[in-house]
Every structure is written in C-alpha cells, then in structure tokens.
Amino acid sequence: MPDSAPILQVENVFAGYVKDLDILQGVNFRVEPGELVAVIGPNGAGKSTLAKTIFGLLTPHSGSILFQGQNIAGFKSDAIVQQGMCYVPQIANVFRSLTVEENLEMGAFVLDQPIQALKDEIFTRFPKLAERRKQRAGTLSGGERQMLAMGRALMLKPSLLLLDEPSAALSPILVNSVFEQIREINRQGTAIVLVEQNARKALEMADRGYVLEAGKDRFEGRGSDLLNDPKVGELYLGAAKAH
C-alpha cells in the first residue's frame, strides 16, 4: 500500500461491556486508505467487540481510535457515520418491515440532497435488489438481506466500511457471491474492515489481516503471509483446511 497516514488507527484500546471487565486488552490495529483488512480469530476473541468499539456502540475504557486523523473514541455512532464510516452488523442488519427501497432510503438519513441517483447506483451493483425493490426486506433470502445491508451502508459513499461476519449463516454459494461484492466494493476505492469467522476466505482476499485471541492482537501481516504461516494455520485455519 502507498506510504500515507492510516485512515483508521486503533491504539492500545481496552474495551468491554462491563466496567473493569475488558474484552479487548490493548488492541492495536490500523487500516491504510483503500485497504481491505481482515480480522479473524476464534469465537470469543473479541472480533465483534472490536467492530462495535470502533463504530461507537461501545466506549473504550482507554486507548485511542483515530479515523481520518481525528480521535473518535467516545463518539456516538451517528457522529461517526457523518465522518465517513459505515457499519454492517452481523444480525438485525435490515428493517424487515420496510421495503428494499425504503431500507436504502433509511441509509441516506443524513443526506440533505436528492438520493435517486444513489439508489440507482445500488440497484446497478445489486441487480437482485432492483428486482425486489418493492418487497419487504423480511421476505428476502439471507444473501439478499446481506446485500441490502451493504447497499444501505453504501448509500453514504463511506471512506471505510466495517463488516461484521457478512458470511454468517449463508450457504457456500451465497458466501461466494457476498465476498465477490465485497471485493468489488474495495476495488472501487472503499477501505474495508472485514470481521469474519471464515478465516481462510477472509485472508485470501485481504491485503492484510489481524488475528485476535483473548482480546489481544496475536498476529498481524499480509493476508497471504498469514495464510501460509504454519502457526496461524495450526491454531486458526485447521478446520478450514479440512474442507
């Protein structure tokens, strides 16, 4: 990646859901402009906690989170959205009672401008959503809901997209489709943090990756290097290798 200031820099962050009980224990993490960075690790490692802390759903107990040069630690999520970061959670990531089109409109809630062109861009990117634009989101398949959640986030043209377990509960075919969309979003210049349980697939597409364990960043490196690291493979990729 080019030599430039990181778009996101997490420095020595401690965070958790209860005061004095830290799940994240001194995590350091960075994303360069335009990078796709994977965050992998076993269940309970703190991956989703890291995503929620970055996006302001949890306030870090200590440490800093610099986004585009500004310390956003302690900011509310709506303020972080306006700074240019969007988040797609693992579950409850669409408004099931609203139509596909209404979901996209909800994604543009902070914009004071016409949004039809933005919706058209999303429908061009996700043709299946265009076909179902008047259907309620609750009637969509799991893969279609994931595409809708990403599409809603992209309505704001974020500088950084934070994805929490986008492959969760999807069939292998749908996983491939969703991951190809993630690749394409990144190719077009959006930096992506991919928090993902499917470690092998995440590292295959990542510029760099981090391995979390027990709330600490145990390994960091290029995605290809982590894939080929015997220790990472033994500890975290064994199940994936068996398939």
Stretch-by-stretch model annotation:
Residues 63-71, 83, 115-117, 121-124, ...:
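Conserved ABC transporter NBD signature motif
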Residues 136-140, 144:
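Conserved ABC ATPase signature
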